[in-house]
UniProtKB/Swiss-Prot annotation:
Name the record gives this protein: Putative peptide transport system permease protein BAB2_1051
Transmembrane segments: 35-55, 97-117, 131-151, 205-225, 229-249, 260-280
Membrane-topology annotation of the record: Multi-pass membrane protein
ABC transmembrane type-1 domain: residues covered: 97-281
UniProt keyword list: Cell inner membrane, Cell membrane, Membrane, Transmembrane, Transmembrane helix, Transport
GO terms under biological process: transmembrane transport
Key word Cell membrane present: yes
CDD domains reported in the protein's UniProt record: TM_PBP2 (cd06261)
Localisation: Cell inner membrane
Domain of life of the organism encoding this protein: Bacteria
Organismal lineage: Bacteria, Pseudomonadati, Pseudomonadota, Alphaproteobacteria, Hyphomicrobiales
Name of one Pfam family that matches: BPD_transp_1
Length: 296
């Protein structure tokens, strides 16, 4: 007799496992996600351990130690003020990662609120989306430069500028998902059962928008790190005395031939961080995005 194929696509050991556990397992089997996670953990650990694995003084100057090349005493060399670049790059990681994560989380939260409001309350849709379209008409970095220049060089200004630039992207992603979800049978059933708008949104709409929003958040995280470095390079980003990868690169551009290490090491840190987060985002997109699953 012909053996009937099982209608289920999961293996027996997976029965009883929570969706979170199953998703985590699929992510850990994804090569890009694993590589990105390892790289990001290295950067994060270096930033967290900076007070213990450096001299702890990113702004300490020494005229005698100016332009020292990389060596045992100064792993990344010193800059034009004699400051230890190993220390400054690791402390710069704290600033860049914190700003990038803050911008990503704020953009996701505010974008989700705007996107769901536009999709659920259709009378606000045109107004909210026209505002988002107006913001998206400008390249994100140009919008951030304009806002940051207007507000002045402060950490809060950088966060406000970058968040304003990336909110529209999150809002449009959430709105697109919410428009589909509001027409589903289980949402109609919740309406007929007398559920309030807030309950439907928090129980049925928002949870099902989290997957695409999480993917977008990771890419915004990477973009924000690059944008913060750009703003600091231009002198309108993270202000002194805070160490920032972009400002370190800017300080080394006049010495790029004789003291190449000043620009090299923060540039490598920016590249590794952005690459790691993008690899994590690729893994999340492949595992969580149902459209890509169907295409595959």
């Amino acid at each position: 007799m012909t053996e009937l194929a099982s209608p289920t696509s999961f293996s027996m050991p997976d029965i009883g496992k929570s969706p979170v556990v199953l998703t985590a397992r699929r992510l850990m089997r994804h090569r890009s996600f694993r590589i990105g996670l390892v790289l990001l953990l290295i950067v994060v650990l270096a930033a967290v351990l900076a007070p213990w694995i450096t001299n702890g003084k990113p702004n300490a100057t020494s005229v005698r130690m100016r332009f020292q090349p990389p060596g045992l005493e100064h792993l990344f060399g010193t800059d034009n003020f004699g400051r230890d670049l190993w220390t400054r790059v690791l402390y710069g990681a704290q600033v860049s990662l914190w700003i990038g994560l803050t911008v990503a989380v704020l953009s996701a939260i505010l974008g989700a609120i705007i996107g769901i409001a536009a999709a659920w309350y259709r009378r606000f849709d045109t107004l909210l989306m026209r505002v988002m379209d107006a913001l998206m008409a400008f390249p994100a970095i140009l919008l951030a430069i304009g806002i940051s220049a207007a507000l002045g060089p402060h950490l809060s200004s950088v966060i406000i500028a970058l968040t304003s630039a990336y909110i529209p992207r999150c809002a449009r992603i959430v709105r697109a998902s919410a428009l589909v979800l509001r027409e589903t049978d289980y949402v109609d059933a919740a309406r007929l059962a007398g559920a309030s708008d807030l309950r439907i949104i928090t129980r049925h709409i928002l949870p099902n928008c989290l997957a695409p929003l999480l993917v977008t958040l990771t890419f915004v995280f990477a973009y924000a790190i690059l944008a913060e470095a750009t703003l600091s390079f231009l002198g309108i980003g993270t202000p002194p005395p805070h160490a920032s990868w972009g400002s370190i690169v800017a300080q080394g551009r006049d010495y790029s031939v004789d003291a190449w290490w000043i620009m090299l090491f923060p540039g490598i840190a920016i590249t590794i961080s952005a690459l790691a987060i993008n690899l994590i985002g690729d893994g999340l997109r492949d595992v969580l995005d149902p459209r890509l699953k169907m295409e595959g």
